[in-house]
Amino acid sequence: MSVYVDDAFIPYRRGMLMSHMMADTTEELDKMADSIGLNRRWIQHAGSWKEHYDICKSKRMEAIGKGAIPVTQWVLNEMIRLKRAKHWK
């Protein structure tokens, strides 16, 4: 079981670049969010196969430093696709 962060680097306000953080389980995602100082209210699509956090570049680096696995946005998209397929079985 793992936590993953992508390399989307989507432009946000004031020059921020945002990525996505997701995990194999909600518990792992919450644990990593807590460890890097994210507010749990910031979770996107809680309890669904799309569950993730949007994180800035500095939080992405912090998550990697605490064990998150960096992946490309394409790999993360494939993981989401597989989660969705599993959900609808």
Named regions from a protein language model:
Residues 2-32:
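The feature represents the first ordered module of a protein
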Residues 2-3, 14-18, 35-41, 60, ...:
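Terminal leader/tail segments of proteins
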Residues 9, 41-43, 51, 59:
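Short, flexible coil/linker segments at or flanking structured domains
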Residues 49-89:
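Short, compact, well-ordered microdomains
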